[in-house]
Amino acid sequence: MSSTPRPHDLVWLNHASALEAIAEPWVAQQWRAALPVVVRRDVDDQARIPVGVRGMKREQRAAGWVQAHNIVRCVTPEMLVERERLLGSPFVSQPPVQAAIALTLHPWSWRWGVTGSTGYALATEIPVLHAASDLDLLIRAPQPLDREALREWLARVAQLPCRADTQVETPYGAFALNEWLRDGRALLKTSHGARLTATPWHREE
C-alpha cells in the first residue's frame, strides 16, 4: 500500500492469517481473505491498522488488527460513488443505490462517498442490501466547509428514496452532520474516543 488506509476504507488482505487479535469464533467460519474488512478508529503501539469484520448477521461485528504490508487492495468510499460503478451495480434498482446516483447529479465542492452496508455491497457485489436499507454517507472535510452548502446537502438528502445519514470526516475525527448543524456542536469520534465539540476542525488541547 502506498498510503495509509483511513477509517471507512475497505481493505483486502493477502491471507486469512493476516487478521490479528480476533476473539469472536464466528469469524473463522464466515470470513475469508477474499472478503474485505473495514478500517475503524483506534490506536496501536505496534503501528497496526485497526479493522472490523462484518458477519452474516447484523449484530456480528468483530474488531481486529492488520499489518499494513498485508493489505493488497483498498477501496475508498469515494471510489464507490463513481457513476459508472453505481450504474453498473447489480443493485442499481435498490433505493440506497438510486439515492447515491441522485447525489452524483450535483457538483458538490467536496469529496464524498458511501459506507456501511451499501458501500460493502457496491464493493463486493454481495447481496446485503434490501428495500429498507439505509444509506450511510461520508463527506471528506480536511478544511471547514460552508454551512449553507452543507444545509443544501442535507435538504437534498432528505428527498432521497431511503433514510440516509451523513458523517463528516475532519483531520481529527468524524461527526454527524445533522447534529452539528442543528445544535452547533456534535460528538466527534476520534481514535482516542469521542468528545463533544463545537469546533471539529481543531485539535483538542
From Swiss-Prot:
Keywords: Nucleotidyltransferase, Transferase. It catalyses: apo-[malonate decarboxylase ACP] + 2'-(5''-triphospho-alpha-D-ribosyl)-3'-dephospho-CoA = holo-[malonate decarboxylase ACP] + diphosphate. Pfam families: MdcG, MdcG_N. Transfers 2'-(5-triphosphoribosyl)-3'-dephosphocoenzyme-A to the apo-[acyl-carrier-protein] of the malonate decarboxylase to yield holo-[acyl-carrier-protein]. The keyword Nucleotidyltransferase applies. GO terms for molecular function: nucleotidyltransferase activity. This is Phosphoribosyl-dephospho-CoA transferase. It comes from Klebsiella pneumoniae (strain 342). The active site is at residues 134, 136. Belongs to the MdcG family. The gene is mdcG. InterPro entries: Holo-ACP_synthase, MdcG_C, MdcG_N. Its EC number is 2.7.7.66. It is an enzyme of class 2 (transferase).
